[in-house]
């Protein structure tokens, strides 16, 4: 089994719901943090094999891929998204460690991102029937 090491850690500032960061989407929040992490850790952007990101309140799609494309990571870097409530960022880090230990990747960037100001609004199914009536 290959050894895995954590070589750096960063986070964005904390902002309240609808506060100063409320206009930023998750890729706009995460990309600068990832860029700074890589620039200060001694690794190169081209060395990164995988980006693993947890996002529990996503609107769908693949947030990790969107974040990878918004950052300075090479376009070839895959984005793996985890939809997990509570400790999802830690799970992303643990999955990154397992990818390295298994020899599937050499360098993984991993963590979590949320924007409660931009979370999707989900309606119960009965509201769908009111908002979009079905005409038979």
Predicted segments, located by residue:
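Acyl-thioester C-C bond-transforming condensing/cleaving domain
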Residues: 1-2, 16-45, 61-62, 68-136
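Residue-level signature of catalytic and energy-coupling elements of molecular machines
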Residues: 7, 48, 89
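Residue-level detector of conserved, well-ordered beta-strand and adjacent loop positions
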Residues: 7-8, 83
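Short polar catalytic/cofactor-binding loops
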Residues: 9-14
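Short glycine-rich phosphate-binding loop at a beta-alpha junction
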Residues: 47-54, 109
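Glycine-rich phosphate-binding loops at beta-strand->alpha-helix junctions
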Residues: 55-60
């Amino acid at each position: 089994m290959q050894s895995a090491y954590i070589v750096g850690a960063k986070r964005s500032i904390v902002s309240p719901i609808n506060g100063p960061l409320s206009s930023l989407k998750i890729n706009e929040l995460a990309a600068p943090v990832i860029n700074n992490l890589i620039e200060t850790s001694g690794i190169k952007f081209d060395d990164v094999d995988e980006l693993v990101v947890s996002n529990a309140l996503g609107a769908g799609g693949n947030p990790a891929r969107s974040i990878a494309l918004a950052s300075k990571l090479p376009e070839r870097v895959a984005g793996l998204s985890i939809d997990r409530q509570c400790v999802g960022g830690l799970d992303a880090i643990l999955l990154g460690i397992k990818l390295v230990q298994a020899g599937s990747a050499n360098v993984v960037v991993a963590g979590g991102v949320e924007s409660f100001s931009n979370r999707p609004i989900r309606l119960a199914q009965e509201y769908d029937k009111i908002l979009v009536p079905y005409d038979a």
